[in-house]
């Protein structure tokens, strides 16, 4: 049986969950349609998803049509959950990008399409909700050509009156774009030679698989228009990116999930081989795990299975598998382009509404961060506060709702702040000698620090010979440096800095690596105090797409938000403004753009790097370390 994995992607409220329900219903996988409004769909499982009518976590279901099994990945549609989208894209054989006939191409549509093209995933456009009043498909086509790609093949004609129907074009009506994109075919056509349908179909298929041509279909998921045709298209156009024939096992973990009973599930896409129940499988060329239970989706339901074949998505109950772990032969994993996960830019303090639920909250955050690497947290050793870092305010709302719904913990969140970093201002050196008070450690250490250009990251080198100070002591110094760089003079991580281990002395046999590990961050702090540090804040590169009449306002308002305009371009009826902006200002700038353009603007942003902050220094409370803080205090007092 052929197995293909497809993604359903769209902007918020374009109808992707409803489309999934219609595909399941029309294929016979389910006997009754679920409803987003009633909260009865197969793929929106959390209370927040049902209440908001949006998808937050990746949902997986399936149907069978003739000799093909189709696994459907119903992905999120909000910017704060793009990491969930990106993790899912890597397992897809193809994608359906939904566009609402009423709303056209939205900001999120552009972001998702960019990701699909970057990762080389064949994509079909599906214009949904064509049965709504006031629809002008020619405007939607133009919107797609201007904002996504001009290389579309409209495969159907839509008759709105007297009875709405969708019919396939005849061959002669759909080949223009295919011919125009191939010089040989165009020359043959212009010379009057006949073109065989087979060579046109082959050309379309090649360009479709190469993501340089995008077939376009129509329908209404809610009214069940065009769904049967879409099922035929899915099963015939998409190919499985798997190794055919006998081969070693290879699979990749793309999702971790915890059930309400706290069972830990790992979702795995198999790319080659066969996975059997009770198999012992090597993970990422390291330890082995034993397959004790295995599930997959069959006609919309999770079912136990005893074997799974190449192309399948399987679910294992396992405590050790991590996101991106590879089962079996790592060399057989397809080499797809990767999209970097967005970098958490905000942090806040969280506490349970009921103090007695603190341990429950920490246990819950451990599970949530295990399944979502963009959520990070730590407990401040000074204040004992729980600090969360995350992407955006919607993600923060989702975490709050998830904690309440699944873990029965209500929380209180403080206003989020931007995550800063630090860099030394100048070169400096500092040495602490053995047996010289107040040094209590059996070690002498000398370190130098030097600022590096922005974006360089951390560099380390040792001038102390391994012949004198062996590897275990050298490793201890590196560990101490890593720890010391976690908190600069303002309490933030230190970056863009070169640190050199210039001098070391030990007494045998009393000195231990622990002495060097403990002393290193104290020496490093004194070097930073001599050098001074400056505060760096995250900057985003952004692109604003807006109607041309709003150019002046968008351009002139940028300095109010500390934005620097780098370039402006005119394309079709739009202006594209390219620039840089502090992360702390992006949300206000977006809100302003949305307001004065009446919602017609799109602002895309991603982390560019860190720059010296222009505002007042923002301090973060230093985390305590009982073993070295007394010594730190003594050195700070004498310097």
Swiss-Prot record:
Record SMART domains: EFG_IV
Residues of the tr-type G domain: 1-242
Source taxon at top rank: Bacteria
CDD domains: Tet_C, Tet_II, Tet_III, Tet_like_IV, TetM_like
GO molecular function: GTP binding; GTPase activity
InterPro entries linked: EF-G-like_DII, EFG_II, EFG_III/V, EFG_V-like, G_TR_CS, P-loop_NTPase, Ribosomal_Su5_D2-typ_SF, Ribsml_uS5_D2-typ_fold_subgr
Matching PROSITE patterns: G_TR_1, G_TR_2
Entry keywords, A to Z: Antibiotic resistance, GTP-binding, Nucleotide-binding, Protein biosynthesis
Residues that bind GTP: 10-17, 74-78, 128-131
UniProt KW Metal-binding keyword: no
Any coiled-coil regions, as ranges: none
Biological processes annotated in GO: response to antibiotic; ribosome disassembly; translation
NCBIfam families in the record: small_GTP, tet_protect, tet_protect_M, tet_protect_M_W
Family stated for the protein in its record: Belongs to the TRAFAC class translation factor GTPase superfamily. Classic translation factor GTPase family. TetM/TetO subfamily.
Protein function: Abolishes the inhibitory effect of tetracyclin on protein synthesis by a non-covalent modification of the ribosomes.
Protein name per Swiss-Prot or TrEMBL: Tetracycline resistance protein TetM
Protein species of origin: Staphylococcus aureus (strain Mu50 / ATCC 700699)
